[in-house]
UniProtKB/Swiss-Prot annotation:
Source organism of this protein record: Herpetosiphon aurantiacus (strain ATCC 23779 / DSM 785 / 114-95)
Cited function: Catalyzes the conversion of L-arabinose to L-ribulose.
Domain of life: Bacteria
Protein name per UniProt: L-arabinose isomerase
Biochemical pathway: Carbohydrate degradation; L-arabinose degradation via L-ribulose; D-xylulose 5-phosphate from L-arabinose (bacterial route): step 1/3
Top class in the EC scheme: isomerase
HAMAP family for the chain: Arabinose_Isome (MF_00519)
Catalytic activity: beta-L-arabinopyranose = L-ribulose
Organism classification: Bacteria, Bacillati, Chloroflexota, Chloroflexia, Herpetosiphonales
Binding of Mn(2+), residues: 306, 333, 350, 449
Keyword terms of this UniProt record: Arabinose catabolism, Carbohydrate metabolism, Isomerase, Manganese, Metal-binding
Amino acid sequence: MLDLKQYEVWFITGSQHLYGPETLEQVAKHSQIIAAGLDQSSTIPVRVVFKPVLKTPDEIYNLVLEANAAKNCIGLVAWMHTFSPAKMWIAGLRSLQKPLAHLHTQFNSEIPWSEIDMDFMNLNQAAHGDREFGFIVSRMRLERKVIVGHWQDSEVHDRIAAWTRAAAAWHDAQGARFARFGDNMREVAVTEGDKVNAQMRLGYSVSGYGVGDLVRFVNEVSDADIDSTLQEYAEQYELAAGLQAGGEQHHSLREAARIELGLRYFLEHGNFKGFTTTFEDLHGLVQLPGLGPQRLMDRGYGFAGEGDWKTAALVRAMKVMSAGLNGGTSFMEDYTYHFGSNGMKVLGAHMLEICPSIAATKPRLEVHPLGIGGKADPVRMVFDAKTGPAVNASIVEMGNRLRLINSVVDAVETDQPLPKLPVARALWLPQPDLKTAAAAWIYAGGAHHTGFSFDLTSEHLADFAEIAGMEYLQIDRNTNVQQFKQELRWNDLYYHLAKGL
């Protein structure tokens, strides 16, 4: 499972020698206290590490090089306790390869009205010191997150936490490998894309494999490993009649376990962080992998169907961002609509592969026919998803840029039971309503595959898109279709011109 405590962000404070050793000692002391306070926050999932106060261009530049090379450092949190002339920061910021957050705070929460003097004023200058730093970062057109408020406020911790989760996902993507079994679902457009461009911009690589490469691992799975996995199934899930040992469909369950283990061994052997399958490339497999992808997603792997490598990478990023939370994150597809008088809703599902982390109750293992793929009836988990606020996101390629589209939704219970629907599913109300949300999504070119999460918010996704240099579009309760279309037009112009700015 994913553990974000292995990562750290460095808390860096800017000042200058002008203030003298006594003031600089106070700056360092205050910075250590703030860093320790953030590090001890139960909200922030990574370590926050104090670094010595930066007073010269060389100190700044060398610190940035150190951060770039540090494997566990996923970003910098900068603060100007005093005034730190920003030309000192140019060389360092120009070399920075890690995400940057700017914490606009001060050590004291209130003005000490009866005690304030010029010593206090000279020490506590973040109100204008951070403005100087903000200018140079904007002048250099560097992306960063600006967080304003007192460092002890819970809201500030929440905003830092969201950014650190996004930074962790970005860090995880650098050098990540994704396996694509078979190719794209034939003639589908949105799941295609420029994998070289994705590696250049997002850091991960996508490698294609014939299904025979997977089949070799599947065929090498031992009976003992299958027996052990079947015991896990019996402990974690309800088993439909016929799947228990000696049942008429027990062989299907053993085959599902064999495929799951083969997939897992392949991914572990190649150090992959996610994968795709497609029902059009199944030669040598008895079933379409269904239960295996469900359980592997639950372990933190990214997954998408039909060769959709962009969504598999997005699901992995969302899994990393949501590590340690308990709401759940899954691959998803907008499947069918309810245009009912009691609220227009979307029923989300897929052929088989929805992650059990979003299940409302204990999943049930069932075997049912699958009309595509031409293989034996596959095993899958069947369940209803949880309810509550969620995000439903897609990454698409627009030629000159990658676009992340986020639809904010509210998952609800189904109006009635679904006894004949043999797949896991989620039902939601898109914000502000289905007509507006669907129109905006279609105008934006959003895919039919998504990453769906109860753990993440729009802030996480916006932070991730900003770090990754992706266009970000949000569909929520404030969306107006005409204004959204204008935003699309403005963005087209911006991204056409931005490289020349």
